[in-house]
Structure formats: structure tokens, C-alpha cells
Amino acid sequence: MKQILSILLFGASSIAMAQPMAEMQPELDHPITEPTATEMTLETPKESKMQSLGQQALQDIKENTKFGGYVIGQAVFNDNDASKVQSNFNLRLIRLYVDGKVLDFQYKLQLQANGFGNDSKGNSPRVVDAWIEWQKFEFAKIRFGQFKRAFTFENPMNPWDIGANGYAQLTSKLAGMSDRVGEHSSNGRDMGVQLQGDFLPIGKDQHNLFHYQFGVYNGQGINKSDQNGHKDYIGGFFVRPIKELQLAVFGWSGDYVANGITVDRKRLAYGLKYDGKINVRAEYARSHGRKIGTDANGLPAAVGANRADAWYAIVGVPVGEHWKFWGKYDVYRDNKEWNSTKSLYNLTAEYYFYKNLKIQGTYSYTHDRTAVDKDYNTFDLQVYYRF
């Protein structure tokens, strides 16, 4: 009985003590509640912007990424008595590419699929383009990777658009296609970084009066690292008085290294390009620097003349909806003297079945003062298809 009374008295005293303490607790204006899921995931403005850019990038990839390619098949016949093969069928080009634009960046990856494995001259399947370009501002775009050298009008042009059965000798020998210095086949490309832009819009159409491009390159062609720490500097400056006409001058200062031999590659080119109802293109280029070859003992050496030059002119005229005809005069001088001249006179006819399929026939008369058979004729038939 005493134990029960003790327990009751202790409980009553505890309640009495707790009541004043409860009254001392200040009342809260708002009750404490658990945070909601939305409040727990609230983002900062920076995080929100990054998420928005990420979503936009994904959308750009879906909408702007393009896969494609083209094939050029060729049949060639000639009457050159010094040639071991006077007729030949081959795949001139097979190209596969992916390109697109994400946010302010344009990109391209292009592979050349035809050729021969482990070809020492670079004519094997290979990466030809792998670049990305920041295009935030029209007057200053920065490109990085492997891409066309900024030299001559014709070099950056697609084989579909040059208007003949092949690039001019000027482009081939002096712009890095199959360069005279002995560089492996590089399709006019090198690895580096380039700044280019357009500015000063004029006229009713507001076309830009000026365009510039300047690049720093390894100087060794595609898929090759720098060999001596000296870079090639290549640039061009364009004036466009009317939308259809461009006038330009190009410069190249660099060198090339192979087998422990270094030769200069200092070049200047200038020309014009008109794209209207007809197409006209003409360029001249000169080069200072020897070639890399072998001496009388078969050892690597700088050989050949220290200078060369080349020029060409081409005109294209459409006839009706499907036909286009071209005429081209094409000259290369390996030592800048007439005794080293190789001249080509071309007539070309193209028939477009539709925009992605055409057949092209070219007749060429060649006068080569350095060859055994100095004068010969060539007929070239090519089929172009792209997808």
C-alpha cells in the first residue's frame, strides 16, 4: 500500500513540474515540417543553365547530325606510248563521313575507304578529316584538328564541284595533294589550328566584303606528327566586291622533313573565282624549295630545282537542266622554266541524272616536255554517286 501511494505522489509531482516548462516554450509562427522533394532538388542558376545547355546539345545532335558519303568510279584510256598501262578501271574515291553542329560548334569526321593497305605513299584507307570549329562569331571562327590547308581556291573544294576529272596540277603539286616535295598523299590537308572569318557586309544582299583565314600546321601532312618543331603558317585574304566574285591572295611559309632531310616550302598564290550563271576560276602559284629524293648513291637528299610554278583557268557553262560543259587550261613547271612544262587541255561534259548522281566524260590533250612521249591523248569516264 505504501509503495502504491509513493508511485502516485511521484507521478503527480512530475506533471506539476512539466506544466510550467511547457508554458515557457515560445510558440512557433510556422510548424516545423519535413522538406518536400521539390525543395530538396532545388538547383542553383548555374546548375539550371548547364542542364539547359545539355538538353539543347542532345537536341542538336538528334536534329543536326548527318551521315553520308560518295563514290567516284573511273575508267581511263590513253595512247601514251611510254605508259605500261593504256587502259584502267579503278575506284577514284570512296568517302564516308559524319558531320553536324552542336550549340556553337560544328564538327566533321571523314574517312577515305579506297586504297591499298600499308601503302608507303599514303594511298591506303585513312582518316582525312577530323575537326571541330567554334562558330560563335561570324568574324572569328576557330577550327582545330585535321582539315584542308588554307591555300588556293581549289584546294578546299569538294571533288564534285571542281568541274573536271581531277584537281589542277597547281593544287596537286603545290597545295599538298601529292606535293612536289615528296610528302605522302595528304588530300590537301594537315593537322593544326585555323582562325577564319567574314566581315563588313555590303550591298543589297549584305554579302561580306572581306574574308580571311590563317592556320598553323605541323607541316607533315595528314596523320603525321611534327618532325622538327617548326610549324607551317598558311593564310589567305579574300575580297568579294559582288556576291558572285572573289579575288584572293594566299601565302605559305614552312618546311618539310623526311629521312633526316629538310626542304623549304615557301609559296605564294593568287586568283579569282566567279560563281554565277557560269563558273570561272583561275589561279597562279609559285614555290620556293627543293624536293626530297635520292642522290646518285641512292641516299636521301634534297634534289631538283629550288623553284616551281603553276597556273590554270577553267570555265563551266550549264546547258539545259541536266548538262554542264567545262573547258580547262592547266600548266605546271617543275623548275619554273619552259623546258619542264607539262600542259593539259581539257574538255569535259557532265550529265546529271539528279543532284546526287552524274556521269562525266573528259578528253585531255597532254604536252609534257619532260616525258618520253611528249604528246598524247586521254579519255576519262567517271560516275559520281553520293548518299
Where are each of the predicted segments found?
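N-terminal periplasmic/intermembrane-space "pro-region" immediately following the signal or transit peptide
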Residues: 5, 17-72, 387
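Hydrophobic h-region of N-terminal signal peptides that target proteins for export
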Residues: 10-17
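Outer membrane beta-barrel
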Residues: 54-219, 227-234, 238-247, 314-317, ...
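Sequence/structural signature of outer-membrane beta-barrel proteins
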Residues: 74-81, 112-118, 151, 202, ...
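Detector for outer-membrane/organellar transmembrane beta-barrel domains
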Residues: 238-335
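C-terminal hydrophobic structural anchor segments
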Residues: 316-367
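Outer-membrane beta-barrel "beta-signal"
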Residues: 351, 375-387
